């Protein structure tokens, strides 16, 4: 297991409000357009966190398959492809040496579109060793 996945498992356990998908709302209209324009019927949320955002909001989207290696309920990366793969507030948490593998995992599952929402600032979250959670 990668050290960073273990760090995020721990962080999710300790911080109840962390990983609730709040960043997704800032990207919604762009994702709405992609879903509409590509007529996407199947979605994968890669790095979904706890996935709570889908329980609270009515997105008018096909219900996405949820994947997040730090969340036991969603930690199995699905095989196969999806019309669209979205990943918001994820890539900046991936160590640089792991990025090619993660990009491959995302793009190899996308048939019609990929949407990456990537923060370019420091995170509020700090890992147990004092490292800022936005490691890339």
What name fits each language-model region?
Residues 112-115:
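Short glycine-centered segments of the SAM/dcSAM-binding site in methyltransferase folds
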């Amino acid at each position: 297991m990668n050290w960073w996945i273990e760090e995020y498992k721990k962080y999710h356990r300790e911080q109840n409000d962390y990983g609730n998908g709040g960043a997704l709302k800032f990207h919604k209209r762009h994702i709405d357009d992609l879903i509409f324009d590509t007529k996407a019927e199947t979605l994968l949320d890669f790095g979904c966190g706890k996935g709570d955002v889908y329980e609270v909001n009515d997105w008018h989207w096909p219900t996405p398959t949820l994947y997040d290696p730090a969340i036991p309920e969603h930690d199995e990366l699905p095989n196969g492809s999806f019309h669209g793969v979205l990943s918001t507030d994820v890539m900046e948490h991936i160590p640089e040496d792991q990025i090619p593998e993660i990009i491959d995992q995302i793009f190899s599952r996308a048939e019609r579109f990929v949407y990456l929402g990537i923060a370019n600032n420091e995170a509020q979250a700090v890992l147990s060793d004092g490292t800022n959670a936005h490691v890339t």
